[in-house]
C-alpha cells in the first residue's frame, strides 16, 4: 500500500511539474479593473511587466493576440523586458510588435540595470517606445506618466519626475519594485509595478515560497495607502525557473474613468 501511494505521489508531482513548465506559463489571464479618476474621458491601459523575453515565441504570440483583442489606448511596461544572458537586440522583435494609439511606455527593471546599455532612449525610440528614467511626459494632455528607475537596483528620483508634471493633471507612477510604494504613496493617485511575478510558484494553504528583494509586503493586485492606489502585475514571463504553478501570467487592463 505504501508503495502504491508513493507511485501516486510521484505521478502527481510529475504531472504538476509538466503543467508548470508546459501549460500554465502560456495561459495568460486578462484581468479587468475600472477605477475613477479626474480624467477628461476614459483611458484604457494595458499594464505589462516582466516579459523576460528573448524571442517571439508561444507566450509572446498569445500576448500580442490578447492585446489586439483588448485594443488598449496605451501600453505601460513596468520593467524586466529581457532575461539574463540575452542582449537587447533579441528583444527587438517582441517590443517592435507592441502598438497602441497613445503609445508604448517603459521603465527600467532590475534586469535592465544588470544589463546596462548606452543610449537607452535612442534604442527604445527606434522601436517607437517612450522610455522614462526619473522623468515624466504626457500620455495625453490630462494624463501624465512619471517613470522611475528601478527601486531595487537603481536610483529612483520621485521628486525629479513629479516636478516635471504640471498642476491639475492626473498622474500615473510607473516603477518596477513595488516596495517603493511605501515612499510613493500619496504622491500620485495611481502607481503601477511588477517585479514579484505574483510569487510565480504557489501552493494552496502555504505562504509564498519566494519573492525578490524590495517587493515589500506586496504580492499581486491592488493596494492602497494615503489616497493612492497601486497595481502589482504578476507579469508575463518567468525567471530563475521556467515554471509557473497556480500563478498564471497576467495582462492587466485598467480603465480610468471620470
Predicted regions and their residues:
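Conserved beta-sheet core of the metallophosphoesterase superfamily
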Residues: 178-253
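Membrane-embedded segments
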Residues: 39-135
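Catalytic metal-binding/acid-base residues of hydrolase active sites
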Residues: 52, 82, 111-112, 136-137, ...
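Conserved acidic residues
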Residues: 73-75, 102, 169-172, 189
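Mobile, glycine- and charge-enriched loop segments
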Residues: 23-57, 164-169, 178
Amino acid at each position: 500500500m505504501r508503495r502504491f501511494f508513493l507511485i501516486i505521489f510521484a505521478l502527481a508531482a510529475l504531472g504538476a511539474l509538466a503543467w508548470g513548465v508546459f501549460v500554465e506559463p502560456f495561459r495568460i489571464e486578462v484581468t479587468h479593473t475600472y477605477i475613477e479618476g479626474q480624467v477628461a474621458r476614459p483611458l484604457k491601459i494595458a499594464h505589462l511587466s516582466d516579459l523576460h523575453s528573448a524571442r517571439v515565441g508561444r507566450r509572446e504570440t498569445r500576448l500580442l493576440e490578447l492585446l489586439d483583442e483588448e485594443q488598449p489606448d496605451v501600453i505601460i511596461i513596468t520593467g524586466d523586458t529581457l532575461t539574463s544572458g540575452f542582449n537587447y537586440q533579441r528583444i527587438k522583435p517582441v517590443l517592435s510588435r507592441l502598438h497602441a494609439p497613445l503609445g508604448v511606455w517603459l521603465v527600467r527593471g532590475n534586469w535592465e540595470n544588470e544589463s546596462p546599455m548606452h543610449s537607452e532612449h535612442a534604442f527604445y525610440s527606434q522601436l517607437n517606445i517612450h522610455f522614462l528614467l526619473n522623468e515624466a511626459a504626457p500620455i495625453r494632455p490630462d494624463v501624465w506618466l512619471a517613470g522611475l528607475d528601478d527601486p531595487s537596483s537603481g536610483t529612483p528620483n520621485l521628486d525629479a519626475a513629479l516636478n516635471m508634471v504640471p498642476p491639475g493633471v492626473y498622474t500615473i507612477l510607473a516603477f518596477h519594485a513595488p516596495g517603493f510604494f511605501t515612499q510613493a504613496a500619496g504622491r500620485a493617485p495611481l502607481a503601477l509595478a511588477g517585479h514579484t511575478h505574483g510569487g510565480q510558484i504557489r501552493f494552496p494553504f502555504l505562504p509564498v515560497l519566494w519573492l525578490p528583494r524590495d517587493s515589500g509586503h506586496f504580492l499581486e493586485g491592488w493596494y492602497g495607502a494615503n489616497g493612492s492606489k497601486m497595481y502589482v502585475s504578476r507579469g508575463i514571463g518567468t525567471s530563475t525557473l521556467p515554471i509557473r504553478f497556480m500563478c498564471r501570467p497576467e495582462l492587466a487592463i485598467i480603465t480610468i474613468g471620470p
